[in-house]
From Swiss-Prot:
Organism whose genome encodes this protein: Methanothrix thermoacetophila (strain DSM 6194 / JCM 14653 / NBRC 101360 / PT)
Gene Ontology biological-process annotations: proton motive force-driven plasma membrane ATP synthesis
Gene: atpF
GO terms for cellular component: plasma membrane
Family of this protein: Belongs to the V-ATPase F subunit family.
Protein name, as recorded: A-type ATP synthase subunit F
Length: 99
């Protein structure tokens, strides 16, 4: 199972330096949506990481699809704090790691 990252050049470079091989730059909304669809179709990807700002600019229908996805589990990181990551991990592995 691999981790994929989609985002701006800074995020892609950072995750690439951390050893993530599937790190894709997407600047426009169209590039972002196309790359997300490509990664979602890849059976080797178990986790997809996006920046919260990129996630927020996606169409609501795609946001819903990503939010409900178990494989890959989609994690939006950035400035917003939420319990969503806890719920996604619980849904993906069946265990609440915070208990």
């Amino acid at each position: 199972m691999e981790i994929a990252v989609i985002g701006n050049s800074d995020a892609v470079i950072g995750f690439s330096l951390a050893g993530i091989k599937k790190a894709y730059e997407a600047t426009s909304e169209e590039e972002l949506i196309n790359k997300i669809n490509e990664v979602m179709a890849d059976p080797n990807v178990g986790i997809l990481v996006l920046h919260q700002n990129d996630y927020n600019r996606l169409p609501k229908r795609l946001q819903s699809t990503l939010s409900n996805s178990v494989r890959p589990t989609v994690i939006a990181i950035g400035t917003e704090q939420s319990t969503e990551m806890r719920e996604k991990i619980k849904r993906a592995i069946g265990v609440d790691l915070w208990k």
